[in-house]
Regions:
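Flexible glycine/acidic-rich beta-alpha junction loops that bind and position SAM and/or redox cofactors
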Residues: 84-86, 141-168, 196-210
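A C-terminal junction/extension of Radical SAM enzymes
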Residues: 171-240
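Short, Lys/Arg-enriched N-terminal segments with co-localized hydrophobic residues
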Residues: 1-23
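Surface-exposed cleft-lining segments at the edges of enzyme active sites
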Residues: 82-90, 114-124, 162-171
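Conserved C-terminal portion of the radical SAM core fold
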Residues: 98-156, 183-198
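Local cysteine-cluster metal-coordination motifs and their immediate loop/turn environment
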Residues: 245, 249-264
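Core AdoMet radical
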Residues: 22-99, 112-116, 141-147
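Well-ordered, non-membrane alpha-helical segments in soluble/globular domains
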Residues: 37, 89-101, 125-133, 169-184
Length: 265
């Protein structure tokens, strides 16, 4: 494909200059869900590529994705907890995966869809829930994370009478991390598991420590990989490239109302 460096307003005002050249812009939807907030559609033309992260591959979203098929990578979030007290207004994993199959049938490239099991609760029950998604998924490229138990998340869990997975701690115990590593080691070695900011899970043969925006994404979008750099850090151990730019402006929980959401509002 023909690649153009561009200077525009809005999203692209964040272009940075390295060595006299403008960096590319890869838009991403981490601050909300693009199946609810469609404001991202007005920004696609100002991006070189877009990574959509959604818990609901709805028919309306599929229609929009197909309009920008050459620019989009889809992360279809599917934890297996949809429709439960933890994700009360999220579609079930069966429905979400059926919608992924519908998108594939519409002609969207399989190599630009990742099933995002984000988060996983590393308990026996939590790993069983994640395994159901893995077994049923038509896509065997996954991005995974463990649940971050922020204080406000623990408070929500208590209000909903959900057992705290790590007691009063933020992250899993070493025993829980070990259980998850053993679970990953038992997976089909042909499956791909990507992690970002999860150093406890890196190092296994089928696990790649790779940013949510990475040179792998750049190549899948047929963009040049020479003039990209790491540095899109959002937190400790983040591996994202500096060309990552948020497309949504929500700073509160969306209407899916997930109990583990990092937004306090």
């Amino acid at each position: 494909s023909i690649y153009k460096w561009r200077i525009t307003n809005s999203v692209c005002k964040s272009h940075q200059i390295y060595g006299g050249m403008l960096t590319m812009i890869i838009g991403i939807t981490e601050s909300g869900d693009p199946s609810i907030d469609f404001s991202w559609t007005s920004k696609v033309d100002n991006c070189d590529g877009v990574i959509l992260i959604t818990k609901n591959v709805s028919d309306k979203l599929i229609s929009q994705i197909m309009k920008y098929i050459d620019k989009i990578i889809l992360h279809a979030t599917c934890t297996g907890m949809g429709g439960t007290i933890i994700e009360p207004y999220v579609p079930t994993y069966e429905h979400q995966l059926a919608q992924v199959s519908k998108l594939l049938a519409a002609g969207f490239p399989k190599d630009r869809i990742i099933v995002r099991i984000d988060p996983i609760i590393p308990t026996t029950e939590g790993l069983h829930t994640a395994q159901k998604v893995i077994d049923a998924s038509p896509i065997k490229h996954f991005r995974i994370s463990v649940l971050d138990a922020y204080p406000h998340v623990r408070s929500r869990f208590k209000t909903l009478n959900i057992p705290l997975p790590y007691d009063e701690k933020f992250q899993p115990s070493e025993e829980q991390f070990h259980m998850m590593r053993m679970w990953l080691a038992r997976q089909n070695m042909n499956y791909i598991f990507d992690v970002c900011a999860e150093p406890h899970l890196a190092g296994l043969p089928n696990v790649r420590a790779i940013g949510c925006v990475s040179d792998d994404d750049i190549m899948r979008l047929n963009l040049p990989v020479n003039n990209i750099s790491i540095g899109g850090y959002q937190r400790k151990d983040c591996l994202c490239l500096s060309c990552k730019h948020e497309l949504l402006s929500n700073k509160k929980r969306c209407s899916y109302n997930c109990a583990y959401c990092y937004w306090k509002g």
